[in-house]
């Protein structure tokens, strides 16, 4: 995905997340592959290259009971119902970025109690990754997002 297209999408679909933060998260989560699928505790032999392949893979994972995340923001299937997502909509770049914004904002609001903005953001990134404020730090996710943010700023 071209940088200008992503910037437009981020500003339109996730306006409450700084574009640099959105870009860093998407860099780490999906590498800008709108059809990316991450399998929790597993891995795909290769990433889908089309919407049809992605939907077939999602259906197979769901039928087998796997926990997985999809799209630009790698939204986890456990969040689909509460965010009003379907496998089809979660693959839409704008919908994925909007869902990313919702999850990240929820995490940030929970993390912000008495913290500096940067501490709260790092805690929110950990929460985005894992649902809590520590796992994303321990597993290096927060560091990868921070690094992606710094690299993209150059």
List each model region and its residues:
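Non-catalytic cell-wall polysaccharide-engagement segments
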Residues: 2-21, 28-36, 44, 48-154
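Helix-loop segments that flank and shape redox-cofactor active sites
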Residues: 39
């Amino acid at each position: 995905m071209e940088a200008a297209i992503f910037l437009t999408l981020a500003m339109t679909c996730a306006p409450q997340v700084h574009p640099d933060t959105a870009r860093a998260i998407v860099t780490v989560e999906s590498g800008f592959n709108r059809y990316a699928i991450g399998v929790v505790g597993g891995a795909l032999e290769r990433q889908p290259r089309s919407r049809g392949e992605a939907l077939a893979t999602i259906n197979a994972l769901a039928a087998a009971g796997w926990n997985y995340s999809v799209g630009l923001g790698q939204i986890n299937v456990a969040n689909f119902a509460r965010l009003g997502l379907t496998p089809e909509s979660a693959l839409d770049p704008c919908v994925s970025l909007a869902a990313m914004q919702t999850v990240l904002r929820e995490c940030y609001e929970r993390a912000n109690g008495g913290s500096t903005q940067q501490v709260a953001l790092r805690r929110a990134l950990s929460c985005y990754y894992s649902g809590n404020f520590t796992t994303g730090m321990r597993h290096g996710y927060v560091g990868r997002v921070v690094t992606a943010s710094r690299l993209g700023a150059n």
